Structure formats: C-alpha cells, structure tokens
Amino acid sequence: MAANYWASTQRKHWLFTRERLAEIRESFKEKDKASHTHFPLPDQRLLNIYFNQQLIKLGKRMSTRQQALATAQVYIKRYYTKNEIRNTNPYLVLTTAFYLACKMEECPQHIRFVVSEARALWPEFIVPDVSKVGECEFSLISEMQAQLIVHHPYRTLSELQPELSLTSDEVALAWSVINDHYLTDLSLLYPPHIIAVMAIIVAVVFKPSSQTAFHGSAAPIAGAMRDGGMNILAALSDKGGAGPPPRIQKLIAWLAESEVDIKAVIESTQELVSLYEVWEQYSEKNCKELLGRMIRSKSLDK
C-alpha cells in the first residue's frame, strides 16, 4: 500500500473543498426534506465519534490494527458523499467498510466471523445473512469506483520523527491527534502530510505529561487546545512575533523551509479545536436512539 500519494486516486478523486462537501450534503437534504424532518440526526462529527467507537468495539473483538480501522472510517466518509445516510443502515455500512478495509490492509477476516461479531454488538441491526454484507461490499466498491487504496498520515509521522527529533510522548500524542482527525472531514479535505504536520505541531506545543493517558484519542488536551490554539495559529502565521520557546521555533523554522501549506495546517488545527468543542455535547445514547429509530421506521434493518 506504499504507492505514491501524488499519483494516487485519493489525491485525484477523493479530495473536496469545504464548499463542495456542503453542496453534496445540502443536495441530499433537498432531495428528501421529509426524511430530514422526520429523522433528525446529531451533528456529523458526533455521528463520526459514535461510528468510530463502534468500529473500535468491533476491531477489539478481532484484534484489528489501527490502520484498518482508519481505512474503514475513510470508506464510510467516501460512501456518504455518494449516499444519503438516511437511506442506509449505518451499522451494515460500518460492518462492511470494516470487512473491506481489513482485506485492503492485508489483515483479512472471514466474512462469517465479521458478521457474527457484528451481530454480537448490534443484534437488532445486523441480520445473520452474510449475503447482506456481500451486497453492501459491492455497493461500497462501486460507489468508490474500486479506488480503495488509502494513504494515511501515520507514515509521514514515522518518517518525520527522526528529522524533528520527536520524543516518544510527542509521537504518541501526534498519533492520537491523527486518530481524532478521522472524526472530522479533514481526510476528505487535505493530503495526509498536512494532517501529520498538524498533529506534530499539536504534540510539540501541548507536550503531554507522563501521567496523561490518551487511549487512542487526544481529547484529554482539548481544554488546553481551546485556550492556546489561537496562540499556535498566531505563531505559525506571524514569524516575526515575540519568540516562542526554542523547541517551537525550531519547528516553525522547519515549516518555513519545508514548503508545507501553512494555511492548510492552520485550518486543520482549527477544525480539530472545533471537534473538541463539539465533543462535549456527545451522547452515545442519543446517537444510538436516533439511528435506531430511523433504521426501524424505514425498515432498513431487513
């Protein structure tokens, strides 16, 4: 899966502008206003958090590595740029994206095993018929035009670790930030190297204490990011300002020489801050109830 990102289908076909994503979602709403009225759903980022938590539960049951879960999240996002979520069974889409991602990331799971474990988690929404996952897999592949290779920021993070002399704590936090970016639209908006650089900046500026446990997410530093996020943005935007600490100065100097799109890095940081703000409203119970009501009312669980 180490093909060149710059020649990839991800770069050519699966990067959008914010305006284009908004147009796509608005078009879904215009086509079926009744469903949007009768079946209100939480903020997309809250749904992303819910889907991510469900994927983690499924992945843990089968000891799946993080990159396969990340690929599954990208597949789900891509699929929902082509399909209105209210016309689907999201649990089936999630299960199928997981199954397909495991194959693509070379850690395949048998379809019967995946269906069995998914049914153990969501028995009211996943039927025992494995052909349903097979049909959904065909739909996923078709909607993505068989463009299934996903380039992730994890690789860039690993490559930059020695160059930027990142500590193990900084790498762990940057990894967690990368995990969290899949809860936003960022994977549809920017190349993976932009996300990796953003994650490194966050990790260096908000260096975690040895007592901080991230458990795969950087949410524990949300408050610090909200309070200090604008200072980071100012430091990155204004190279001539009062000097930040030497560690951050070194990072800013590297950024200036690297020709990385700093505007994109800043926008990505702002998106992450926004995610952590909306996360405070997250309710797993609410997401589950609203999705369940929609699925049962529209008989999407059959």
Curated annotation (Swiss-Prot):
Keywords: Activator, Cyclin, Nucleus, Repressor, Transcription, Transcription regulation. One of its GO terms (molecular function) is cyclin-dependent protein serine/threonine kinase regulator activity. One of its GO terms (cellular component) is mediator complex. Signal peptide: none annotated. It comes from the Eukaryota. It is found in: Nucleus. SUPFAM superfamilies: Cyclin-like. GO terms for biological process: positive regulation of transcription by RNA polymerase II. Belongs to the cyclin family. Cyclin C subfamily. PANTHER family: CYCLIN. Component of the srb8-11 complex, a regulatory module of the Mediator complex. Component of the srb8-11 complex. The srb8-11 complex is a regulatory module of the Mediator complex which is itself involved in regulation of basal and activated RNA polymerase II-dependent transcription. The srb8-11 complex may be involved in the transcriptional repression of a subset of genes regulated by Mediator. It may inhibit the association of the Mediator complex with RNA polymerase II to form the holoenzyme complex. The srb8-11 complex phosphorylates the C-terminal domain (CTD) of the largest subunit of RNA polymerase II. This is RNA polymerase II holoenzyme cyclin-like subunit. It comes from Emericella nidulans (strain FGSC A4 / ATCC 38163 / CBS 112.46 / NRRL 194 / M139).
